[in-house]
């Protein structure tokens, strides 16, 4: 069974059909925020559109821990879900859209501020470790739910400190590790080059020095993943 979505499947360019989305938009600005997110997700290659949680579990079952994908949420209160393979199996994390930003649904008892972003790709990139960074070991289990943040651990020499994030599910406390997206299609050479360029543009001045056509192409997808 496939959950209907008002958004087309990844890679398709037909107009959005607003009659099929179960969750309604709270404002015109939220509608535009979600439409922009979908456009970039379709370019990403790891947006699996209307697959269900069960189908996501099958897709990720043979993949190593840290593999993830983005799909339409089956929950009528949300637009997107992050499905990630962990050492304890596939976990599904709802992506909240409120106040003009996206965030992972967090543990309501946590006192830490929830990281928020104007783009789903930026949200995903935030939770990915930098190149060469080690994975965090699993801490002792404790009952809770959703996602929580903990202070940075002692970094290795030459590496900046990084906060650890954990998934709370069924009494387990599982490190949230996003290592590799699961591709839904074969990326073009242009897109691969664009991701590489995005990963090396660390200042606005560098972007403004590029030709206008290249800047426009980069603006359509401004993430390195």
Swiss-Prot record:
Keywords: Growth regulation, Phosphoprotein, SH2 domain, Signal transduction inhibitor, Ubl conjugation pathway
Residues of the SOCS box domain: 177-224
Free-text function comment from the UniProt entry: SOCS family proteins form part of a classical negative feedback system that regulates cytokine signal transduction. SOCS3 is involved in negative regulation of cytokines that signal through the JAK/STAT pathway. Inhibits cytokine signal transduction by binding to tyrosine kinase receptors including IL6ST/gp130, LIF, erythropoietin, insulin, IL12, GCSF and leptin receptors. Binding to JAK2 inhibits its kinase activity and regulates IL6 signaling. Suppresses fetal liver erythropoiesis. Regulates onset and maintenance of allergic responses mediated by T-helper type 2 cells.
Annotated spans, Disordered: 131-162
Pathway(s) this gene product operates in, as recorded in its UniProt entry: Protein modification; protein ubiquitination
Extended SH2 subdomain (ESS): annotated span: 34-45
GO molecular-function terms, A-Z: cytokine receptor binding
Ranges of compositional bias, category Pro residues: 131-142
Region of interest (Kinase inhibitory region (KIR)), residue spans: 22-33
Superkingdom of origin organism: Eukaryota
Pfam families associated with the record: SH2
Protein name per UniProt: Suppressor of cytokine signaling 3
Organism: Canis lupus familiaris (Dog)
Subunit structure: Interacts with multiple activated proteins of the tyrosine kinase signaling pathway including IGF1 receptor, insulin receptor and JAK2. Binding to JAK2 is mediated through the KIR and SH2 domains to a phosphorylated tyrosine residue within the JAK2 JH1 domain. Binds specific activated tyrosine residues of the leptin, EPO, IL12, GSCF and gp130 receptors. Interaction with CSNK1E stabilizes SOCS3 protein. Component of the probable ECS(SOCS3) E3 ubiquitin-protein ligase complex which contains CUL5, RNF7/RBX2, Elongin BC complex and SOCS3. Interacts with CUL5, RNF7, ELOB and ELOC.
Stretches that traverse the bilayer: none
UniProt comment concerning the protein's domains: The ESS and SH2 domains are required for JAK phosphotyrosine binding. Further interaction with the KIR domain is necessary for signal and kinase inhibition.
Single GO biological process annotation from the record: protein ubiquitination
Residue ranges constituting the SH2 domain according to the UniProt record: 46-142
